[in-house]
């Protein structure tokens, strides 16, 4: 019984010592996020990568227009963007490009008319 208790304690300590970011990521997925993909697909070219581990250093494998390539990652704030129920009648206008462009805990979220800074929702 004592050996089983020690093994269980060791397993719990191993899991508890993992950084929180490790949970929720696929194996081989690097931390951070892909930058927004605003480019139109003008020319179909072969993917340069299929997953993050094929990219050097801290770069991530992300869609850019219509193919995947290794790009610098961006940091992401906690929470998720609220769902947008609107339709846009004017041209797109981006007030931010990444979370770091927004103050405090606000996130750079896509809306019907572009991206803007919004308070995140839990999730």
UniProtKB/Swiss-Prot annotation:
Record GO cellular component, one term: extracellular space
Repeat is among the record's keywords: yes
Location of the WAP domain: 27-73, 74-121
Keyword Disulfide bond: yes
GO molecular function: serine-type endopeptidase inhibitor activity
Disulphide bridges: 34-62, 41-66, 49-61, 55-70, 81-109, 88-113, 96-108, 102-117
Alphabetical UniProt keywords: Disulfide bond, Protease inhibitor, Repeat, Secreted, Serine protease inhibitor, Signal
Protein name, UniProt field: WAP four-disulfide core domain protein 5
Native organism: Aotus nancymaae
